[in-house]
Structures are given as C-alpha cells and as structure tokens.
C-alpha cells in the first residue's frame, strides 16, 4: 500500500524519535521536541510532514522557512531533517513527501529548497541527486571549538553580553547600515529562534558606551542536517560600519567560542555567500576552514 503524506503533529513525536534512532543510531529527543514546539508557535515558518502506511509512521520531513540568508530574495525552505523507515524505502514515500513539501513551498511564494549533506553520505547524496538538487554556490566553513588565543594588548576588550529580546531594534538599525536593506522581519525571526528555538542560548551583542554596535546570531542544535554531535550554527555576524576594525567582530567570535567550549560543543559552522569576500577573510583569519559538508539547492519553478 502506498504511503499517505500528511502534516506532522505532536502526536507523532514518539514515532519520529524512534524512527530517527533506527536510521541514525542515536535518539534526538530534545531536537525534535524543540522543532515541534517551534512549529506550534510559528506555523507559517515551519513545514513538517509525515508519511504513514496503514496508520503507522514510515517517514518524516522537518523544514523551515529562511528569510533570505541563503541568497534567495523570496526566501528558501531549509530541509533540516528527513527520514524514511529502512523497511519502506524504494516505495516512493520520500519522493511523495518531498513533492508535497515543494507544493507547500510554492504556495508560500518560496523560490528554492536548500539543505546540507556530508560528501560521504552516499545514500543522502543519491536521494538529492534523484530529486534534482544541485550544488549551491555557498561555502560551508567550520571551526573546531577550542579557546582562541588571548589578546595580550593593553586595551580593554569590548563588552560582549548575551542577546536580549529588547535588542531587536538596534540590530535592525546596525544591519541596515551594513546591508543597505531593511531586514527587520528576518532579524525578528532570528532573534526569536536564538532565544526560544535553540537548544542553548548562545547569541551575543557587543556594546560601546552602553549601546549595541555589533551582534552574532547563532544556534546550538543536536540534530540539524543529520548532526549527531553538538554543533553550533553561526547564522549572521555584523558590526556597525562606524565601529569597524575596532575589534568588535573578533570579540564577539572569541566570546562565542569561549561559551561553546564551556558547553562542550564540538564545532561552529556557517554558510558564506561566494561574493562575501571580506567576511570570508575574517572567518579564515579566525581559523575557519572548508567543511566536509556540502550545500545543495533546488530551484522551485
């Protein structure tokens, strides 16, 4: 019997965790709990589907809407987690779930699906190839989490503190000075994700004379894109151009690494657009290197 594709619900939680553990060899209860809670709070930002055969769950898809950080002006849908029961593979469940995901994305005006995979995950790569994904132009960089060298200059380090809900207006203003665009909706979503959806709150703000002048938005998840270890994702980092080259970006990244090391997070990962040369140079100077993971994209026509 063919699998039926339907919305994923909270009642599917135990079945999803059990199926994912059979596929990956480890239970990710906290990850799926966070994702289902996030979808309940913001249903327009999340697309979560289940495949069921004779009432039993045989597959799942977890995806979320991105706000343009992946190079698509209309936004993209990020395919975060995907699984099909090994006993039900090659029966079309994965293909039907992906087709339904694409339909829902088009209905919301989304222009692309994006995801990541390790270059040695041959089963996933084969599925993405069959689904007509292509290599994305973005580079994935990563940094093993270990404490950075201490700055031995006499100047006091910039003040860096945890992100707070009330920082949004300042972050939008700083980002507009950097990009020339009003990305208020994007940053509002990122602040909400950082404060409520991340397994641990690690986003930071840098201050000068009591006023925010820079920020680093990141999440710690125990499951995105098939990560089984603790991996942090750096979504965006920015410093007010009027305070550029004053050490704020380095202070933000250094404090983040210190915090992640204390939490036993293994690595920090980010995606960078090919034309973001200044950001790439900063990250490479800070120790980031090319990841063994690859970015993929599928245009929705």
Regions found by a protein language model. Give the residues of each.
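Acetyl-CoA-dependent GNAT
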Residues: 10, 18, 22-74, 80, ...
């Amino acid at each position: 019997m063919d699998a039926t594709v339907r919305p994923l619900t909270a009642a599917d939680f135990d079945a999803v965790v059990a199926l994912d553990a059979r596929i990956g060899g480890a239970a990710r209860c906290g990850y799926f709990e966070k994702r289902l809670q996030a979808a309940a709070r913001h249903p327009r930002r999340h697309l979560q589907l289940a495949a069921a055969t004779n009432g039993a769950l045989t597959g799942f898809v977890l995806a979320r809407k991105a706000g343009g950080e992946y190079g698509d002006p209309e936004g993209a849908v990020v395919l975060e987690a995907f699984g099909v029961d090994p006993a039900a593979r090659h029966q079309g469940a994965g293909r039907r779930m992906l087709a339904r995901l694409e339909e829902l994305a088009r209905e919301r005006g989304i222009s692309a699906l994006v995801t990541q995979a390790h270059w040695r995950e041959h089963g996933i790569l084969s599925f993405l190839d069959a689904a007509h994904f292509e290599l994305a132009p973005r580079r994935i960089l990563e940094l093993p989490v270990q404490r950075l060298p201490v700055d031995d200059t006499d100047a006091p380090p910039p003040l860096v503190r945890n992100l707070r809900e009330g920082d949004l207006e300042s972050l939008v203003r700083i980002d507009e000075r950097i990009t020339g665009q009003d990305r208020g909706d994007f940053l509002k979503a990122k602040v909400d994700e950082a404060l409520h959806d991340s397994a641990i709150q690690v986003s930071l703000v840098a201050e000068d004379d009591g006023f925010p002048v820079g920020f680093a938005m990141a999440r710690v998840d125990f499951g995105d894109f098939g990560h089984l270890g603790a991996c942090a994702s750096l979504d965006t980092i920015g410093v007010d151009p009027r305070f550029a080259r004053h050490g704020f970006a380095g202070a933000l990244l250094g404090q983040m690494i210190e915090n992640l090391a204390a939490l036993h997070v293994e690595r920090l990962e980010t995606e960078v657009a090919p034309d973001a040369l200044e950001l790439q140079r900063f990250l490479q100077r800070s120790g980031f290197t090319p990841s063994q993971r690859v970015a993929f994209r599928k245009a929705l026509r």
